[in-house]
A protein has these predicted regions:
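N-terminal small/polar-rich segments of proteins
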Residues: 22-94, 124-164
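N-terminal signal peptide c-region/cleavage motif recognized by signal peptidases
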Residues: 18-20
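Bacterial N-terminal signal peptides that target proteins for export
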Residues: 1-9
Length: 164
């Protein structure tokens, strides 16, 4: 009986040690996920999520003598009125005491701190694709490593004269 228990205990120990060995060579990964599902009646979403999720390079190009531009598209819809947009702060790139002012065009309209219509009632009633362009103002730029943020706000504005 003692031999049976000893053999069984030895086999159990062997099985457990091989499990531990297997676990020591295990790899685990976590992937962060996010999702946004807009309402069917109002949305303003980039066609390429990298536009808003990754840094956009506006570096100076010696071959052209200009800063790179940021270009992209947004799908826009408001089935009950127009879409207005504004900037949350003055758009600029900053490097220490130096700054480069930026121009932000959405649907070919320059955005400011004051909300303005960027997509009309008839265009926004169906999925409308609006271009975005961010460019540097001026032609002379001081050397440096610049960073900045362009923060835009989009509002669903009810139709003039009531609902549809």
């Amino acid at each position: 009986m003692f031999k049976k228990i000893a053999i069984t205990a030895s086999l159990a120990a062997l099985a457990l040690s091989s499990s531990v060995t297997f676990a020591a060579s295990e790899a685990r990964h976590s992937i962060s996920l996010i999702a946004h599902v807009p309402t069917n009646g109002f949305y303003v979403v980039p066609t390429d999520s990298d536009l808003v999720n990754k840094d956009q390079d506006m570096s100076f190009q010696p071959s052209t003598g200009k800063m790179r531009e940021v270009n992209g598209f947004f799908d826009v819809r408001n089935n009950n009125g127009s879409v207005h947009a504004s900037l949350e702060s003055v758009p600029k790139l900053i490097s220490g005491a130096e700054a480069i002012d930026l121009q932000v065009l959405f649907n070919n309209k320059e955005l400011t701190l004051t909300p303005q219509m960027v997509v009309g009632e008839s265009e926004s009633d169906v999925n409308y694709r609006a271009p975005l362009k961010i460019s540097a103002k001026g032609t002379t730029f001081q050397p440096g490593d610049y960073t900045g943020v362009v923060a835009m706000t989009f509002d669903a504005v009810p139709p003039i004269g009531g609902g549809k």
